[in-house]
Amino acid sequence: MSGLMFRFPFRRFVATMPDKTKYIAKSGTYPKGFLINGVSSGVKAKGALDLTMLVSEKPCNAAAVFTKNAFQAAPVRVSRETLQQTKGQGIQCLVVNSGCANAVTGSGGVQDARLITALADKAVLGRGDGGLPSTLVMSTGVIGQRLKMDKISSGVMKAIEGLGSSHEHWMRGAKAICTTDTFPKVVSQEFSVNGQTYRIAGLAKGAGMINPNLATLLGFFATDAPVAVEAVQQILREAVDKSFNAISIDGDTSTNDTIAFLANGASGGPEIDVSSPAYEELKQSVTGIAQKLSQLVVRDGEGATKFVTIRVRGAATEADAKLVAATISNSALVKTAFFGEDANWGRILCAIGYSGAIVNPKATSVSFVPADQTESLRLLVLGEPQNVDEERASEILSHDEFGLDVDLGSGNHETVSWTCDFSYEYVRINADYRS
């Protein structure tokens, strides 16, 4: 066999990258009593924005959810420690840097994160040593490198000088937390609870290492509604479960994931706790904005050309529904088929089958759903393969947005998740990340 060379046909697929600038917020409605700024500290090259500071004029009730990765980054450990010490009360500042993750940096990295907290507490609030901390910290970027604290320290002071509440200030804050993101992610809205109008805004960064249970995903929400600390914690957990924990880009889970929620009550009104009639209304508003923000993260997936909504119905349990959705979302074979606009639905069934959920093949149905919500294209009905119109399948998959519907026929539980495709560009971005 030596000396023989076999040539196989190779179909090179070239997809047009969708225009993502349409997702950039042109204006916003922002919560009272919060100031923000994004600056260049010098951690990133060429003067790129790399440090964001959010300050509340009033003490906030706050909560956060963190990565489940065993190698939790120093800022994750320090922010978790701060929330435990303060019981989520009295938080007034948030500092986020990009370009260096301060992860797997040992005790020195933890000391650096604590130093940022102390620096912000003193510079913004005039607090010296001895009191409880009031600043949360987040970092994102390359793992295994220590922060350049001289640059971070000067960046904090620089950010303080330019704090403001305009749309431009919020956009600068969003840009400064980005790494491989192609656009800043800002969502804001007004909402009413018991006739009282409040505002909420959210920022997030993330384009790679995104997987349910959080990933290289940083974000925070700020509202001027008066929310009890227990309600802040519960609302954030439930909102994240239906948003950031329901997305996937590449199946990797980072060391730095953090989503925080701060409520300063600057707009007044009675405090909302878990037993208040307004609690459910508030939770729905926060969940809605969390879903919008998390979907922007998927739309900005590294090299992504497709945004796919995966709906799983008829599961025996909610856990089974989530398991099937997550397995499909993370399948490299499914995602590459989406990129190639190839209706290779066998890959989808394969993922469903190995998901670990209770699956009855004879009860399972699968369909592609067009973006315009016209008639679905049935691929499998009660375990029986359909005569698939390949031309229509290709037409559905040619759009930059479509859906996949899975009915397991085993119960009445359902879930929805969002994912994207894998393109050549994803490989290029991650192969060159440190260069």
Curated annotation (Swiss-Prot):
Pathway: Amino-acid biosynthesis; L-arginine biosynthesis; L-ornithine and N-acetyl-L-glutamate from L-glutamate and N(2)-acetyl-L-ornithine (cyclic): step 1/1; Amino-acid biosynthesis; L-arginine biosynthesis; N(2)-acetyl-L-ornithine from L-glutamate: step 1/4. Its EC number is 2.3.1.35, 2.3.1.1. GO terms for molecular function: glutamate N-acetyltransferase activity; L-glutamate N-acetyltransferase activity. InterPro entries: Arg_biosynth_ArgJ, ArgJ-like_dom_sf, ArgJ_beta_C. GO terms for cellular component: mitochondrial matrix. It is an enzyme of class 2 (transferase). This protein may be expected to contain an N-terminal transit peptide but none has been predicted. This is Arginine biosynthesis bifunctional protein ArgJ, mitochondrial.
